[in-house]
């Protein structure tokens, strides 16, 4: 039960529901921001977490899928989860690289290699689901629906 809870929490860690205004197209035509752009913004928030914890938390939370927010919310609970192990190993990461491994109409998966702040290397799989943007329903958004637990390895991003 505890493992299931942590897996669900880790899934939500990667998730966020709304897209920041700088990315949303507020015009009348529907648009979708590419998932790799959203992933880059999310990972930048992890990378710079200590420099701007509230802004980073807001970005990560806002890209969470609504189903994950139901499980890991409210936001204060999510923050506490993010600051605890194993999720805290993602915060203030030094480097990362990612490759798209699965692409369907509604889901995209990325393999992400990370150099953590403690100089450990690990890999996670990040899963996005296409859904309506909560703050701008005319647009679709790639929202984090799952993140696997870190899998450690020897070296290299």
Protein language model features and the residues they cover:
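Sec-dependent N-terminal signal peptides
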Residues: 5-14
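Exposed beta-sheet edge and beta->alpha loop/turn motif
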Residues: 101-157
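Short solvent-exposed beta->alpha transition segments
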Residues: 53-105
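Short, low-complexity N-terminal intrinsically disordered segments enriched in polar/charged residues
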Residues: 17-56
């Amino acid at each position: 039960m505890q493992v299931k809870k942590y897996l669900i929490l880790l899934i939500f860690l990667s998730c966020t529901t709304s897209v920041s205004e700088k990315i949303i197209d507020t015009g009348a035509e529907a648009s979708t921001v590419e998932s790799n752009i959203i992933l880059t913004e999310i990972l930048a928030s992890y990378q710079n977490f200590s420099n701007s914890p509230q802004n980073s938390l807001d970005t990560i939370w806002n890209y969470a899928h609504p189903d994950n927010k139901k499980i890991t919310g409210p936001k204060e609970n999510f923050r506490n989860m993010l600051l605890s192990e194993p999720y805290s190993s993602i915060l203030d990461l030094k480097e990362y690289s990612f490759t798209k491994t699965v692409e369907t109409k509604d889901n995209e998966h990325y393999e992400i290699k990370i150099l953590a702040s403690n100089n450990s290397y690990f890999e996670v799989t990040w899963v996005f689901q296409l859904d309506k943007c909560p703050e701008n329903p005319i647009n679709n958004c790639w929202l984090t629906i799952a993140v696997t637990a870190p899998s450690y390895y020897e070296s290299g991003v």
